[in-house]
């Protein structure tokens, strides 16, 4: 039971590694791969169609610019696909966000925020999905959420350090 983290190019890794770091925190196994919707369409088709049989339970797909990777991956598989819009230089990721979020009815992509926050949250969401059938992963997610709460409660006054 693992997660597939795919991205359109190697330059997307600095963003997408945050998804991997969150999965590491929850002890969720994953694989990473560059799979370009435009430059390697057959590789994308093969990856997505074989994902379920290879034990992939969730695909996290990050892409910038035209950002067709998440939608095309979703078109080829019944495995849940989480789309991460990678921030681009030209439009600061808005182009990526709109490309990923505007899917036609019938092909679902869970779209996250632009950039690093979206990648980290994709890792968390993938762990939550895995956790629905894995008590250890769910316990790790719940512990993380508790830590988040405690960090806020420890110092609720922003004027104090």
Swiss-Prot record:
Residue positions binding substrate: 9, 12, 39
GO molecular function: 5-(carboxyamino)imidazole ribonucleotide mutase activity
UniProt EC number: 5.4.99.18
Pathway in which this enzyme or protein is active: Purine metabolism; IMP biosynthesis via de novo pathway; 5-amino-1-(5-phospho-D-ribosyl)imidazole-4-carboxylate from 5-amino-1-(5-phospho-D-ribosyl)imidazole (N5-CAIR route): step 2/2
Leader sequence residues: none
Membrane found in the keyword field: no
Gene Ontology BP annotations: 'de novo' IMP biosynthetic process
SMART domains hit by this protein: AIRC
Function comment: Catalyzes the conversion of N5-carboxyaminoimidazole ribonucleotide (N5-CAIR) to 4-carboxy-5-aminoimidazole ribonucleotide (CAIR).
HAMAP family for the chain: PurE_classI (MF_01929)
UniProt protein name: N5-carboxyaminoimidazole ribonucleotide mutase
Species in which this protein is naturally found: Aliivibrio fischeri (strain ATCC 700601 / ES114)
Gene name as annotated: purE
């Amino acid at each position: 039971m693992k997660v597939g983290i795919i991205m359109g190019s190697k330059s997307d890794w600095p963003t997408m590694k945050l998804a991997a770091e969150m999965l590491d925190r929850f002890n969720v196994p994953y694989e990473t791969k560059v799979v370009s919707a435009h430059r390697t369409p057959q590789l994308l088709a093969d990856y997505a169609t074989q994902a379920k049989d290879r034990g992939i339970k969730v695909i996290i797909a990050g892409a910038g610019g035209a950002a067709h990777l998440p939608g095309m991956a979703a078109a080829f598989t019944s495995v849940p696909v989480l789309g991460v819009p990678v921030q681009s230089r030209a439009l600061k990721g808005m182009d990526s966000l709109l490309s990923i979020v505007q899917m036609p009815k019938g092909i679902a992509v869970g779209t996250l925020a632009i950039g690093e926050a979206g990648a980290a949250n994709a890792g968390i969401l993938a762990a939550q999905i895995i956790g629905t059938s894995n008590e250890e992963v769910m316990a790790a997610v719940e512990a993380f959420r508790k830590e988040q709460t405690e960090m806020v409660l420890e110092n609720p006054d922003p004027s104090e350090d």
